[in-house]
Amino acid sequence: FYNEQYRNILCGPYYYKASAYRAMENFLDVSHFPYVHEGLLGDRSYPVIKPYTVTINSKGIETSAIEILQPDPDGLGKESYVTYYYQVHRPLIASFTKITAAGEFFMFLALTPLSDVECIGWM
């Protein structure tokens, strides 16, 4: 995950009142963007997610490019299409790369289950 062009920022712990698997599902689900992150990462008037593929390989589970129209994907206040690539490395460890006109953003999530209904997230 090392890239000299990235600025590394460690975040967490974040305590979730949800199972670790539910928290991971939310991290991987781009279809919620228009409803939960409306105005920034999604727009209810355009909830369409174009088809993409999911493959299993030696790295884990990976998606092809997921193209999404976002109202303000990088804080510059301009609507544009962005591209996400997701990887699931282990059952509770995943990452995505988001490519915008302003550059590239990478996020890594590792979840620690505390109980059936609580977990801790690290980014």
Question: What do these predicted regions represent?
Answer:
Residues 1-123:
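C-terminal catalytic domain of Rieske-type non-heme iron oxygenases
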